[in-house]
Amino acid sequence: FADEMTLTEYVDETNNFHLSYPTEWVLEKKAGATALFKNPSVKYASIGVTVTPVRIDSLKEFGSLEDIGAKLVEAESKKQTTVPGGTFMERQSERESVDTKTTFYEYEYRLITTHGNKRVYNYVGVRDRTLFIVNAQAYEIEEGGESEADEKTRALYREVGRSFDVLK
C-alpha cells in the first residue's frame, strides 16, 4: 500500500450508493458483487459492495449490533478454510451516515485460515428495504496484523467504510 493513498469517489446511481476507493485500484466484475475494487499490486486486497432487496426496514429488525456480529463470526468459523477457533471480533460499532442518517453496523474481525491470517471489515446498512454491505479484506503482512503496512490498510479500510452512504 502506498504511503498516502488517494481516494476517488465512486457513485452508483442504479444501486443508489457512493463510496470512496483507492484511485489506483481497479473496478472488476464479479458474480454476486455490485462493485468490486481490487488492488492491482496486492493479490487478495479487495473492497466489495453488495446491494440486495430485503423485507425489513432497518438493521434493528434483523438483530442488534452484537447479535449480527456473533452471527457473522459464527458463519466465518464454519468455512472450510477457517482454522478451528480462528475467528476473532476486533471491533464492532454503530454509526449514522452523514447524508441520509442511515444506521450502519461496522465490524472488524480477524480470521486465521489455512491460507494465512486475514483481516475483514464489514459495513452493513438497510435503507428503503435494501441491504447494503461493504466488505473489505486483506491478508496480514505480519503475524498479528500490527506492522506499519497492516496499520495503513486498517486506516484505509476504515476511511472507505466511513465514506460509504446511500444516495438521497
What is the predicted function of each stretch?
Residues 1-6, 27-133, 138-146:
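Conserved polar/disulfide-associated segments of primarily extracytoplasmic proteins
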Residues 8-11:
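Short amphipathic
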Residues 14-32, 161:
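Proline-anchored loop/turn motifs at beta-strand termini and strand-loop-strand connectors
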Residues 16, 62-66, 147, 151-155:
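Soluble non-cytosolic domains of exported or imported proteins
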Residues 17-20, 99, 126, 152-156:
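Structural motif
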Residues 19, 49, 84-85, 156-158:
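A general, composition-driven signal for non-globular sequence regions
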Residues 22, 34, 69, 73, ...:
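Extracytoplasmic/secreted envelope proteins and their assembly/folding machinery
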Residues 25, 131-168:
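Surface-exposed amphipathic alpha-helical segments
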